[in-house]
Amino acid sequence: MAGKRLFQDLDSDQENKSEKRIKSVLPSLASPISSVFGALISENTLRSVLEPVIRKVVRQEVEYGISKRFRLSRSSSFRIEAPEATTPTLKLIFRKNLMTPIFTGSKISDVDNNPLEIILVDDSNKPVNLNRPIKLDIVALHGDFPSGDKWTSDEFESNIIKERDGKRPLLAGEVSVTVRNGVATIGEIVFTDNSSWIRSRKFRIGAKVAKGSSGQGVVVCEAMTEAIVVRDHRGELYKKHHPPMLEDEVWRLEKIGKDGAFHKKLSSRHINTVQDFLKLSVVDVDELRQILGPGMSDRKWEVTLKHARECILGNKLYISRGPNFFMILNPICEVMKALIDGHVLSSQESLNQPYVKNLVRDAYSKGNFLEVGERTANEAALLTQGDDLDQQYAASHYQNIEIDKSYQQNGYVQERSTNNLEIVNEGYITTPAEFNICFTGSSSQNHINPF
């Protein structure tokens, strides 16, 4: 009421002052106007026209001035009463980094493929239990935030990303979780959109205390993950594997697109997997380059071959044997060790001899499969032993190898029981004991390559 009376008193004073000003101003205005329009406009007529207009303008200005002063006064009083900002005493952190790559619609997990966990800690990162639940909001953040190690709550809020127009919420799933006993678990959460449309082209996942959940006197700093790229789910169908697997389709290699020119050329020559690609690169690299054609530049070739070479070969080994030789090959046709005419070859120089390469090429071109074995614990060391030991081995063991004269050179055997550690029946060459190979049989599939 006091404010209203103040407004009325001010309004009355302003009106009186305005009226006096108008009366003093109007005669001076009337004189020149009257001289122009002559007898058409009298002083009284001019006053009756202008006076309401001027009154209205004065009233509006007075109202604006009073309301502005009232707002400033009330804002100042609020600032005085507001408590001072407190420094966070606790903070939230994500226990582990995220598993990448991340695709839209795919469940987000940590590096160990477990649900994301958020823990409450103090300044020294020691777990804290407040003995009461705290609700958290899970949000998406700009990947380039923050610029330093610290941030304010206002900065955190201003970097929360909302969905694009016409899109679903950017994060779907458990976007609200509860900290109990100092830990919160996000059971399932996914991104619904890729990160290519924002300035940093990356997202972070953030966690903040929901409004009204922390309680008086407790300030909790927000948590956020590392910056990650989120790709469209449809890209997962065409993504490259790092590292590739032997059985992966060949287009999983860099620079070879699915259903592209290189993929079609390779498929036409029965090179369908990463293993097929690697085997031919070992046996006849020139033929492989010829299949790919001039479109595969030297630079592209280096990238593709380097990617293929990242492949994990595993423990499987393959045995090729004939009347005067015994060879151990890895899954991509590289000779690990060979026994030829009583001499054990293990050095790289000896394994690169033309005769050995011809044996490898012959094994590769056969339509049957080689015997399959696995490395034993000592096999890796044996494959790298020196020539002196090789000579001793050849002298003491070669005479014990039985040879079936009717057995074809580089002959193959069909599937055998996994219990047979040494093939001795039917007069075949027995496996040299110190090669430490455990036989698991051979495949029964039929395709052009023997492995």
From Swiss-Prot:
(Microbial infection) Interacts with V.dahliae SCP41. Its main location: nucleus. It is found in: Nucleus. Belongs to the plant ACBP60 protein family. The keyword DNA-binding applies. It comes from Arabidopsis thaliana. Residues 149-270 are annotated as: DNA-binding. It comes from the Eukaryota. This is Protein SAR DEFICIENT 1. Disruption phenotype: Compromised basal resistance and systemic acquired resistance (SAR) induced by Pseudomonas syringae p.v. maculicola ES4326 toward Hyaloperonospora arabidopsidis Noco2. Plants lacking both SARD1 and CBP60G fail to accumulate salicylic acid (SA) and to express PR1 and SID2 upon both biotic and abiotic stresses.
